[in-house]
C-alpha cells in the first residue's frame, strides 16, 4: 500500500419503516428508495426495518447493477430487519443476536419478536480492511417511564463488546444504525467511550440537513407529533459512527440528512431521516490516530460511564428478580388452587364448579411458569453484562494501582498492542 494512500467512502443509512400491512405507502417508498440508491451510487447502503423478505428481494434485484453484493440478516420470529447493499465484494459476514430484547408479553411493542441484532460485513478495499456494522436497538417508547432502559444499556454494552472483539484485524471500523438513544443517553455514551468511535455529525466539516442532525423531525408526515411534543426540533437517534486503527486516519468530509420531505414527491422515504456521510481514509502515523490515544483525561469519563452502566444494570436486575419472585408466588397459589379443585372434585360436593375452574387454573400456572422462566433469563442476561462491566472496572483499578502513568492498554483489552503484534 502506497504511503500517500487515500480512499473515499460514501455511506448511506436509513431506518426504512417497512412493517408489512402497517407502514403507510411501503411499496412506493421502497421503489423510490431503490431509485435514489441507484442514482447516488454509494459505497455502502445499510438499512434497518426491512422486515419483509419481498421488500429485500425487490431492492436486491433493483440495486444489483449498482450494488452487486447484498445480504439480509435474519433472526427472531419476524426477522431483524437489517440488510446491506455494497458496491464492493463482501469478504465475510456474521451477526450477533442480543441476549435481552424486551418482553414477549408486550406484544403491542413487538421488539422481542424481531430478534434485534448487529450485523457485520468485512470488506477489503485497496488493501485496507473495513469492518462495517449495522444494528437496531430496542425502542424507548416512553422516556419518562422507560421500562426498557436496562435492556438498551445491556444491548449497547453487548454491541460495544462485539465490535471490540471482532475489529482487532480491521483498519477502519464503521457502525451505522438506529440506536434508539439520544446522544447524551447512557447507552450511547457507553458505546462511544468503550469503542472509541466518533460521531460523524459531530466530526464533519460540512453538514446539511435537519436542525441539530435530528433523524425524527416534526416535518415528517409519518412521525407521531404527540411523541415529539417534548422535542420541538425532533430527536437524533440514528448514527454513523467510525474510527481508524493502526496507522490510518479517517475524517468525515461531509454529512447530510434528509429533512422530513422529498422535494420531488412530497412524502419522505421513511418516518426516520436518511443519513449520508462521505468519509476519507488515509495513512497516518499511529501516534496521530485520535482513536488510538487514551490518556488520563479520557479515562475519567469512561470510568464514570462504566460505573453508571453497572448501576443501571443492577437496578434492572432487581426489577427482574421482583417479577420472577412474584411469578413464583402465583405458581404456588395456582398449584394450591389446583389441589383444592382436585379435592372438591373427588368429594363430589362441588364437582361441576371444580371442573369449570380447572382449565383457567392450569392456564394461570402455565402462564406464571413462562413468566417466571423469562424473568429468570432476564436476570441472567443482566447479570452477565454487569459481571463483564465489573471485570473491566476491576482491571481499571489494577491499572491505577500500577503507578502514576496511565495504563489504557489494560483498560481497553490491549487492542492496539494486539494489533501491533499481528503486524
From Swiss-Prot:
**Can you tell which superkingdom this protein's organism belongs to?**
Eukaryota
Q: What is its EC number?
A: 3.1.4.12
Q: Where is this site: Important for substrate recognition?
A: 180
State the compartments where it is located: Cell membrane
Listed GO CC annotations: caveola; cell periphery; endoplasmic reticulum; plasma membrane
Q: What's the catalysed reaction?
A: a sphingomyelin + H2O = phosphocholine + an N-acylsphing-4-enine + H(+); an N-(acyl)-sphingosylphosphocholine + H2O = an N-acyl-sphingoid base + phosphocholine + H(+); 1-O-octadecyl-sn-glycero-3-phosphocholine + H2O = 1-O-octadecyl-sn-glycerol + phosphocholine + H(+); 1-O-hexadecyl-sn-glycero-3-phosphocholine + H2O = 1-O-hexadecyl-sn-glycerol + phosphocholine + H(+)
Q: What InterPro entries does the database record attribute to this sequence?
A: Endo/exonu/phosph_ase_sf, Endo/exonuclease/phosphatase, Sph/SMPD2-like
Give the residues the record marks as binding Mg(2+).
49
Q: Which GO terms describe its biological process?
A: ceramide biosynthetic process; intracellular signal transduction; response to mechanical stimulus; sphingolipid catabolic process; sphingomyelin catabolic process; sphingomyelin metabolic process
Q: Which EC class is this protein assigned?
A: hydrolase
Keyword vocabulary terms for this entry: Cell membrane, Hydrolase, Lipid metabolism, Magnesium, Membrane, Metal-binding, Sphingolipid metabolism, Transmembrane, Transmembrane helix
Q: How does this protein sit in the membrane?
A: Multi-pass membrane protein
The active site annotation covers: 272 (proton acceptor)
Q: What is its main location?
A: membrane
Q: What does this protein do?
A: Catalyzes, at least in vitro, the hydrolysis of sphingomyelin to form ceramide and phosphocholine. Also hydrolyzes 1-O-alkyl-2-lyso-sn-glycero-3-phosphocholine (lyso-platelet-activating factor) in vivo. Also acts on 1-acyl-2-lyso-sn-glycero-3-phosphocholine (lyso-PC) and sphingosylphosphocholine.
The record's family statement is: Belongs to the neutral sphingomyelinase family.
What name goes with this protein?
Sphingomyelin phosphodiesterase 2
Gene symbol here is: SMPD2
Amino acid at each position: 500500500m502506497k504511503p500517500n494512500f487515500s480512499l473515499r467512502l460514501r455511506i448511506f443509512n436509513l431506518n426504512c419503516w417497512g412493517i408489512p400491512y402497517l407502514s403507510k405507502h411501503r411499496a412506493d417508498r421502497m421503489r423510490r428508495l431503490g431509485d435514489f440508491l441507484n442514482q447516488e451510487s454509494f459505497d455502502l447502503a445499510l438499512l434497518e426495518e426491512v422486515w419483509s423478505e419481498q421488500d429485500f428481494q425487490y431492492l436486491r434485484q433493483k440495486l444489483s447493477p449498482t450494488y452487486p453484493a447484498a445480504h439480509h440478516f435474519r433472526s427472531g420470529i419476524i426477522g431483524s430487519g437489517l440488510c446491506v447493499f455494497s458496491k464492493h465484494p463482501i469478504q465475510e459476514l456474521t451477526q450477533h443476536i442480543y441476549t435481552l430484547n424486551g418482553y414477549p408479553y408486550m406484544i403491542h411493542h413487538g421488539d422481542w419478536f424481531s430478534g434485534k441484532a448487529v450485523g457485520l460485513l468485512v470488506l477489503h478495499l485497496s488493501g485496507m480492511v473495513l469492518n462495517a456494522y449495522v444494528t437496531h436497538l430496542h425502542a424507548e417508547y416512553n422516556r419518562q417511564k422507560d421500562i426498557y432502559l436496562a435492556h438498551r444499556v445491556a444491548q449497547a454494552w453487548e454491541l460495544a463488546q462485539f465490535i471490540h472483539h471482532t475489529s482487532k484485524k480491521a483498519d477502519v471500523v464503521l457502525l451505522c444504525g438506529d440506536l434508539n438513544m439520544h446522544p447524551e443517553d447512557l447507552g450511547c455514551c457507553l458505546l462511544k467511550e468503550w469503542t472509541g468511535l466518533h460521531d460523524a455529525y459531530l466530526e464533519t466539516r460540512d453538514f446539511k440537513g435537519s436542525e441539530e442532525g435530528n433523524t425524527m423531525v416534526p416535518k415528517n408526515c409519518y412521525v407521531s407529533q404527540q411523541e415529539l411534543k417534548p422535542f420541538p426540533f425532533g430527536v437524533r437517534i440514528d448514527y454513523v459512527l467510525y474510527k481508524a486503527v493502526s496507522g490510518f486516519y479517517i475524517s468525515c468530509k461531509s454529512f447530510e440528512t434528509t429533512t422530513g420531505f422529498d422535494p420531488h414527491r412530497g412524502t419522505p422515504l421513511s418516518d426516520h431521516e436518511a443519513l449520508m456521510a462521505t468519509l476519507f481514509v488515509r495513512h497516518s502515523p499511529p501516534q496521530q490516530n485520535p482513536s488510538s490515544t487514551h490518556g488520563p483525561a479520557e479515562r475519567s469519563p469512561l470510568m464514570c460511564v462504566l460505573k453508571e452502566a453497572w448501576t443501571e444494570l443492577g437496578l434492572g436486575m432487581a426489577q427482574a428478580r421482583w417479577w420472577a419472585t412474584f411469578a413464583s408466588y402465583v405458581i404456588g397459589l395456582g398449584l394450591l388452587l389446583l389441589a383444592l379443585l382436585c379435592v372438591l372434585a373427588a368429594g363430589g360436593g362441588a364437582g361441576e364448579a371444580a371442573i369449570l375452574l380447572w382449565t383457567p387454573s392450569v392456564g394461570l400456572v402455565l402462564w406464571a411458569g413462562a413468566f417466571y422462566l423469562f424473568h429468570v433469563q432476564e436476570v441472567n442476561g443482566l447479570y452477565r453484562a454487569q459481571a463483564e462491566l465489573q471485570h473491566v472496572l476491576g482491571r481499571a483499578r489494577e491499572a491505577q494501582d500500577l503507578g502514576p502513568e496511565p495504563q489504557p492498554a489494560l483498560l481497553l483489552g490491549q487492542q492496539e498492542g494486539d494489533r501491533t503484534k499481528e503486524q
